[in-house]
């Protein structure tokens, strides 16, 4: 007898990479909007989380459009995590566009144009369309031929007869030969479930009817049930696009298939800068759709991290962009106190690296440094997320290290310590592993001290 053994699926290969904010699942607020001490991957920062909860409510009720929020606080206090939690609370349907201040500087595109591009990435458009469709299982597929009008012995397809069956009956359709080409492209055969759009003639193969599911043992087919209702029905289709998608679609129209147009596309590798005129035209079309009730504007969130990297030109443009009729909610983050604004001639210091006229427009959310107990809880959560086990003494040692140096350094020591404990044949990370990691990897303060002592060389 031939031996057959079942291959067990390797679960470890499915696990996604553990990133810096993998553990963040939301703001962790209760029904009254009050922050729970440890919830949604957050520990502490109750006031900041509650403030962000109010911002989320304002965004959902569409009362926050064109306003800006600044999350300010020392490094490693969860500013980026708060912005990520806001995006998760809003859900996947609301556009969220995260960028870093230095991303706006490019040799090909102007700074202001790059900022406007990201502005429009953060504004969604929900288009609702009612389409007439014929949906059912194919029970007949007969092309009808006719004499070639151009002469000769060949024949052309004049039309195609398609029979469709649904739960409530059958219909036989006489379709144009162009639709027959679409049917051939989709490789439709009898027994497939398809739908045909009445207006455009687009054909979509949904899958194979589940009545044929037992025909073969090994198949890569997707079996679907027989469509409910009548063959001819009206379907409401909702599409979510951003204004930037519409800009790009209109900025790069599809050229012909001739050699000149193909050469033109090859010779133009540079990024296309979308003009203000094109954006204005797109805005007019969008406004028309909104007035007709066909589309709905969904203001999203533009998150700009390290806002102190922006210069005076961008800040001036940002002031104007926030006042425009179509603007998203802008969330800024800065870990600077009083610092010089880039591009200012007088070198005057401003709070958080933002000019005073922009600071007036911002709602400022403050994040505070973590205490030792909070650091201990965060390290414990990260360890469980990475599948590591620490002894109580090792956790205490790491939390003290996080308090004296930085939380990031303490969290970064976890994985190397896990490797050392596995190499030594231990199932738990001990104080010895932490001390060895501290010896092998310097933190910023010890590294600076070494440089000061050696002065001219490492």
UniProtKB/Swiss-Prot annotation:
Gene3D superfamilies: 1.10.8.60, P-loop containing nucleotide triphosphate hydrolases, RuvB-like helicase, domain II. Keywords: Activator, ATP-binding, Chromatin regulator, DNA damage, DNA repair, Helicase, Hydrolase, Nucleotide-binding, Nucleus, Transcription, Transcription regulation. It is found in: Nucleus. GO terms for cellular component: Ino80 complex; NuA4 histone acetyltransferase complex; R2TP complex; Swr1 complex. Its main location: nucleus. InterPro entries: AAA+_ATPase, P-loop_NTPase, RuvB-like, RuvB-like_C, RuvBL1/2_DNA/RNA_bd_dom, TIP49_P-loop. ATP binds at residues 73-80. GO terms for molecular function: 3'-5' DNA helicase activity; 5'-3' DNA helicase activity; ATP binding; ATP hydrolysis activity; DNA helicase activity. Residues 1-18 have a biased composition (Basic and acidic residues). Residues 1-20 are annotated as: Disordered. Pfam families: TIP49 (PF06068), TIP49_C (PF17856). Disulfide bonds: none annotated. GO terms for biological process: box C/D snoRNP assembly; chromatin remodeling; DNA repair; regulation of transcription by RNA polymerase II. It catalyses: ATP + H2O = ADP + phosphate + H(+). Its EC number is 3.6.4.12. May form heterododecamers with RVB2. Component of the SWR1 chromatin remodeling complex, the INO80 chromatin remodeling complex, and of the R2TP complex. Belongs to the RuvB family. DNA helicase which participates in several chromatin remodeling complexes, including the SWR1 and the INO80 complexes. The SWR1 complex mediates the ATP-dependent exchange of histone H2A for the H2A variant HZT1 leading to transcriptional regulation of selected genes by chromatin remodeling. The INO80 complex remodels chromatin by shifting nucleosomes and is involved in DNA repair. Also involved in pre-rRNA processing. This is RuvB-like helicase 1. The gene is RVB1.
